[in-house]
Amino acid sequence: MAVVVSNANAPAFEAKMTVYVFICVMIAAVGGLIFGYDIGISGGVSAMDDFLKEFFPAVWERKKHVHENNYCKYDNQFLQLFTSSLYLAALVASFVASATCSKLGRRPTMQFASIFFLIGVGLTAGAVNLVMLIIGRLFLGFGVGFGNQAVPLFLSEIAPAQLRGGLNIVFQLMVTIGILIANIVNYFTATVHPYGWRIALGGAGIPAVILLFGSLLIIETPTSLIERNKNEEGKEALRKIRGVDDINDEYESIVHACDIASQVKDPYRKLLKPASRPPFIIGMLLQLFQQFTGINAIMFYAPVLFQTVGFGSDAALLSAVITGSINVLATFVGIYLVDRTGRRFLLLQSSVHMLICQLIIGIILAKDLGVTGTLGRPQALVVVIFVCVYVMGFAWSWGPLGWLIPSETFPLETRSAGFAVAVSCNMFFTFVIAQAFLSMLCGMRSGIFFFFSGWIIVMGLFAFFFIPETKGIAIDDMRESVWKPHWFWKRYMLPEDDHHDIEKRNA
């Protein structure tokens, strides 16, 4: 399939969607599958009695008591740390991964990620005490930090610009598939006593092995090769992934971008310059907003949440499987729409969509779920339905676009550093939500859904006023085509920086 990459201000680069690029995309995106599996598995394991008896006996005792506060049964800081420690480690690892991405390349960084994943899987599945369990989660976090740094950059840099949105969302698609697989594994291993939780935690080893050996088959990105002065290799790589002979214009554009990037000795300091503020601010706030939609609170703790509203253990795990299935299907919708309707439309539509769902869930719980007892069956089913509809809206918008937009808007000279900051922000806010959600649920009860509703209003307004459309724009032409025409961000495009654009046009 051939496409011509063009926009009003950018050159046109001919490219084909080759089989080889598709294979590279699918192998790299396995990193997203592991991330999704780790998101989904922790909530289901946290609801398993064998796991709770082994590591969190106080929570297990509370869970058995019918008259225990519905909203507080699982409120335990160490139980929350089991989930959240992964994201704390990922936060730190993403900065190290930024350096390896720049110095060694995107492919070796993915290989490091797979090794960390395998170590983490061994420690968590074989854990004999809480310390060993948490250390294993930390190693998984190192893998997440390296994988989430390298994979979206890799996908953005090998994709033709007109297909970049859809191909980049494959990462988020694999995250959702990982969550679904984890939910299915949780459902079946919950009945395997007393070591079902070990099987569930050990399952992440399979995609980690696939990523480790699959990464040996994929090509390094042309941008990464040229950035490290391997110009001839970069040119051959570009010809291979584009599937056309005439790649000289795009090659020269990448070389020029790399020349400019090489003049930046401190990319993190460069991020603080006025011209870097638009992608920097948007990249950070997208990570904040993505987490404060409340999505990971639901995905982490879906089985726990469904037990809270009255489902039994098996029914709660099955409901999580249904939610995960909706998540996957809706992500396919996002892949189809993102390069057709654009990024802004999806962000704005889903903000209204998710707000309505959160309000309805909050109202039902406030009205019908007391401190003890359970919801009636009809109300519980309505909650599950609106959780699914809510997940649907997130899956085709803020989920994938929270990764896509930062990966495509930073210029090359700050791309690795800027995306490292974005990944770190994502991991930090994910850590905050994972560590605090069960305590917030205990303290705020149904009010937690109104809390997230308030955040959805804020992020919808931010998207309306401050996030420009980037559909179809070449990745190294964002400054000229996106930021300079924007009503607000153009104030940061100072005249002294215009030599960048003049040199680029001359090249």
From Swiss-Prot:
Gene3D superfamilies found in the cross-reference section = MFS general substrate transporter like domains
Q: Which residues cross the membrane?
A: 21-41, 78-98, 115-135, 138-158, 165-185, 199-219, 280-300, 318-338, 345-365, 381-401, 418-438, 447-467
Q: Name one Pfam family in it.
A: Sugar_tr
Q: Which domain of life is it from?
A: Eukaryota
Q: Which Gene Ontology MF annotations are present?
A: monosaccharide transmembrane transporter activity; symporter activity
Topological type in the membrane? Multi-pass membrane protein
How the protein is activated or inhibited is described as: Inhibited by uncouplers such as 2,4-dinitrophenol and carbonyl cyanide-m-chlorophenyl-hydrazone.
UniProt-listed GO biological process terms: carbohydrate transmembrane transport
Compartment(s) of residence = Membrane
Membrane topology, Cytoplasmic segments: 1-20, 468-507
What are the record's GO terms for cellular component?
membrane
Q: What is its main location?
A: membrane
Q: Which InterPro entries match?
A: MFS_dom, MFS_STP/MST-like_plant, MFS_sugar_transport-like, MFS_trans_sf, STP/PLT_plant, Sugar/inositol_transpt, Sugar_transporter_CS
What PROSITE patterns is this protein classified in?
Answer: MFS, SUGAR_TRANSPORT_2
What are the UniProt keywords, alphabetically? Answer: Membrane, Sugar transport, Symport, Transmembrane, Transmembrane helix, Transport
Which tissues is this protein detected in according to the database?
Answer: Pollen specific.
The record's function comment reads: Mediates an active uptake of hexoses, probably by sugar/hydrogen symport. Can transport glucose, 3-O-methylglucose, mannose, fructose and galactose, and, to a lower extent, xylose and ribulose.
Q: Which family does it belong to?
A: Belongs to the major facilitator superfamily. Sugar transporter (TC 2.A.1.1) family.
What protein name does the entry list? Sugar transport protein 6
Source organism per entry reads Arabidopsis thaliana (Mouse-ear cress)
| Organism phylogeny | Eukaryota, Viridiplantae, Streptophyta, Embryophyta, Tracheophyta
